[in-house]
A protein has these predicted regions:
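Bacterial N-terminal signal peptides
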Residues: 13-25
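An acidic-aromatic pocket/loop used at catalytic or ligand-binding sites
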Residues: 2, 8, 25, 29-215
Length: 215
């Protein structure tokens, strides 16, 4: 089972997921959809006896991710690409959660970077990455997270940075472990604003068939 994780892909596939649940007519299946004033899906829940998919859009904040908002920064809204999202998939022991929100600030990227380098220390060591390459030290957190760990190392998950407005050609800050990551990523500035995304990843457990251990 491979899940491609990206806000745009998730939001676009919600209608299909709901339709399939209704067509299949799974016993005990429950579908609940809340729409905003424009008729767009804001909250979708699909629950079955085997698990469920819960998606909330435009309701996630930095506090939900366990991070502060940069002083004076404002949430970027107004298009699908920058909608905040809280996505939870659970099927038996297979659990995945992704939360993301984008902000803009009139301050420089350097100031925002310095702020979040300090804020991320609540989750342990903080590494700085440019793409998959470390910048400075440390190059790995004490829990084993490095710049190549972006969710795609998990065979059950494909994480698309672009869908969360994280430019792989720009600086990213990371803290945590391979399974539980907090990321601050930057995109190209626009309208005089430094734009950045806050992302938390809780990835499903992966067992090493050779060692029997999990990441």
């Amino acid at each position: 089972m491979i899940r491609t994780i990206g806000r745009n892909r998730i939001l676009a596939s919600l209608g299909l997921a709901v339709s399939l649940a209704l067509v299949v007519g799974i016993s005990g299946c429950r579908v609940h959809v809340d729409k905003d004033e424009n008729g767009d899906e804001k909250k979708v829940q699909v629950d079955t006896p085997f698990g469920g998919v819960h998606v909330n859009t435009d309701q996630t904040t930095a506090a939900d991710l366990g991070l502060p908002v940069y002083p004076g920064a404002t949430e970027i809204k107004g298009d699908d690409k920058h909608k905040s999202a809280d996505v939870h998939l659970g099927f038996g022991e297979w659990e995945l959660r992704v939360r993301a929100v984008s902000y803009g600030s009139s301050d420089s990227e350097e100031k925002v970077t310095a702020f979040y380098k300090k804020a991320l220390t609540r989750y342990g060591d903080v590494i700085t990455c440019n793409g998959k390459s470390p910048v400075g030290t440390p190059t790995m957190t004490s829990e084993g997270l490095n710049c190549t760990d972006n969710g795609n190392n998990n065979p059950n998950v494909k994480f698309d940075n672009g869908d969360f407005n994280i430019d792989t050609g720009k600086i990213q800050l990371k803290a945590g472990s391979k399974r539980h990551q907090h990321i601050v990523g930057f995109e190209d500035p626009k309208d005089g604003q430094t734009r950045f995304a806050l992302v938390s990843l809780d990835l499903p457990d992966v067992v090493d068939n050779k060692s029997g251990s999990s990441d």
